[in-house]
UniProtKB/Swiss-Prot annotation:
GO molecular function, one term: fructose 1,6-bisphosphate 1-phosphatase activity
Entry superkingdom: Bacteria
Swiss-Prot/TrEMBL cofactor(s): Mg(2+)
Gene responsible for this protein: fbp
Residues annotated to bind substrate: D113, G114, S115, S116, N206, Y239, Y257, L258, Y259, K269
Cofactor note: Binds 2 magnesium ions per subunit.
Protein name per its UniProtKB record: Fructose-1,6-bisphosphatase class 1
Stored HAMAP family: FBPase_class1
Organism: Shigella sonnei (strain Ss046)
Amino acid sequence: MKTLGEFIVEKQHEFSHATGELTALLSAIKLGAKIIHRDINKAGLVDILGASGAENAQGEVQQKLDLFANEKLKAALKARDIVAGIASEEEDEIVVFEGCEYAKYVVLMDPLDGSSNIDVNVSVGTIFSIYRRVTPVGTPVTEEDFLQPGNKQVAAGYVVYGSSTMLVYTTGCGVHAFTYDPSLGVFCLCQERMRFPEKGKTYSINEGNYIKFPNGVKKYIKFCQEEDKSTNRPYTSRYIGSLVADFHRNLLKGGIYLYPSTASHPDGKLRLLYECNPMAFLAEQAGGKASDGKERILDIIPETLHQRRSFFVGNDHMVEDVERFIREFPDA
């Protein structure tokens, strides 16, 4: 049995930025995940369920667990003195860590994806993305350090809190998964170099918003529902409403996750920096693809911290089909 800590040290030589700092940074995220796992499992017994009454930078009501997870991850990262600052879906601006000006890395995160599902005991997750800073080491980080395209990521991953808690990450050398053993307090390697199955058969989208979708996406949904033995259709529809949980299932079983633009969210709803980029990095490392319908997600130059984007991620052939339908059936 190999633990996450042992695996990270063993694989350091495989990526170009192999340093003790990055290893320690991933260990800090691991610690934060353990704390969140512990408290999610007793959320109904302590007063951390439901809405907090506050709103985040996008005007969305924050759940109590959103704020809890954000603070625990932030504290775990700051305690190691290896991160110069963070950007979070739950923070209006970047958070500069005082006394960490010589740290090389910045972290972007969605502390608790799908948190509205907590009240009904559905899987949720944590998403993280790691970059090397671009401003001079020894100075405080600025927003410039965070507004980097996804193809500059050093590492990315997610933690899914479900029937078991799993941490999945990449440093650009494959995707690896670890299951948390609460009796030992360690994450243990369960899958190395994960890949999407060759053919996907599941599509994940909130079809309740069908009337609001672009024409190309509507056509693709109909394509998924049509019977065609040569392409193994119809596909199966599965949608949890938690990006991490939907992505994780599709990574294991094969499929595509779709979150297109709508009339109320013309730029899409998912955040480029906190959700799209890290999941796109993981998808490509697992042999999949990620797109906004027209452009590779990892090539998009971000303009603002909380920028949104349409998002299609999963098996490469399925994402390519969506792109084709969007090209062929543009909105009037």
